Amino acid sequence: MAMTIGDIEKRVRAVLMDDVPPDYRWSEAFILGAIEDGVAFLHSIRPETRYVDGILTDGVKVPQGAKDEEFPVHSRYREAMVAYVAYKCLERDSADTQNLNLAETYLNKAKTLMQV
């Protein structure tokens, strides 16, 4: 079964314990934007991931309401994307020193998983 953008969002929310609607800490728009950033970051580390079904893509735009769309990156990078989006969320909360340290941990995890 194909992974969707909504699957990534759901997993990120579970990791960050932000999965009780409607009181989300991070908005859907922010998380979808972070997914776009994560794909661009993955492409910078692993340029070959820009090929989707043998076709070179120029990046991913995640429009609002696109949660049912198929995630355009190989499933082996799912946890890397989750870690990167968690990093972006916690980085936004960087006034809290603990969150800043945790954000760095997630960024390092994302980088490691992207290089596998």
Where are these regions (language model features)?
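Conserved short "hinge" loops at termini or chain/domain junctions
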Residues: M1-E70, R92-V116
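Elongated alpha-helical scaffolds
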Residues: S75-Y84, K88
